[in-house]
Amino acid sequence: MLTPQPQAKKLAQALGLKTGLYLKREDLHPHGSHKGRSIPVMIAMYSKLGWMNFCISSSGNAALAAIYAIKADKNLSLYIFVGRHIPKDKLEMLKLASGGNKKIIIEQVDRPKQTAFQMDKKGKAKNLRQSTDDSALIGYEALAGELAEIKNLAAVFIPTSSGAMAQGLYNGFKKHNLNPQIHIVQTPACHPFIDSPITGPSAANAIVDKIGLRKEGVLKTLKDSGGRGWIVFDEEIHDIKRKLFDINETELANISANSALSIAGLAQAIKNNWRFNGPVVCLITGR
């Protein structure tokens, strides 16, 4: 098993969940987050097809996963495109992770997504874009295999940006003849898969894909699994972190707002009297 999935009995009690709760600690993945399930698989697949140069538009978890994967193969190179106004701490984080590797180029541009798209279009580098590339789903099937070890698993709550992990997990569970509820959790700032007039800022700043190109597939996943989408506000995220402190789960209390999103989504479901007939998993995704 690549990452731990401990049972969280005290947190389940604090939330009022009686069927059992597990936390999947993807924040402890060797590549830093759940993106380590998918990005390296994409790189490995495309390198076998002859691609040696890769590019990505990301300033967070996806970029970090790509950096770690590229550093493991001296024959590959990576271009990371970030915006002109990227927070200084994020830029320094990427530079630190790259470790001065000359085959990893971090470039600030006006339009990161379009720059990566054009580089791919010209055949100069393969764009690692999870929002449109179905090879991004493959790596999450292994994650589904680990979660499948939880007996009578009833539901999974997923902080969701592009929707790739939700779809990939659903596909993986089918291979294990399982169909737990898939619940996605988004923010007021970004919820393309959830039809709602709600808008506003959010501390969960890794949820950024406002276009929702996977909408059809994600909505099918929710319908077929019996899950749904939830929009979580900052106040709910902070409430979860306070609960973690109150029950002396100090390590978990320091998880990012992005990671706390899944637990806050579960808390909202419980308040809305959502029914579970077995244990629930909340994905702790990373930064």
Task: Give the label of every model feature segment.
Residues 1-52:
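Positively charged, low-complexity intrinsically disordered leader regions
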Residues 27-41, 128-147, 254-261:
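A glycine-rich, Thr/Ser-enriched phosphate-binding loop motif common to dinucleotide/cofactor-binding enzymes
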Residues 36-40, 53-68, 88-91, 137, ...:
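Short glycine/serine/threonine-rich phosphate/pyrophosphate-binding segments
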Residues 42-50, 64-75, 170-176, 264-274:
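Alpha-helix C-terminal capping segments
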Residues 46-68, 75-82, 154-165, 279-284:
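A short, small-residue-rich loop immediately preceding and capping a beta-strand
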Residues 77-155, 201-219, 228-230:
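Small/polar-residue-rich loop-to-helix segments that shape phosphate-bearing ligand pockets
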Residues 93, 110-124, 175-257:
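Active-site/ligand-binding loops adjacent to catalytic centers
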Residues 196-204, 260-287:
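Phosphate-binding loop/pocket of nucleotide- and phosphate-handling active sites
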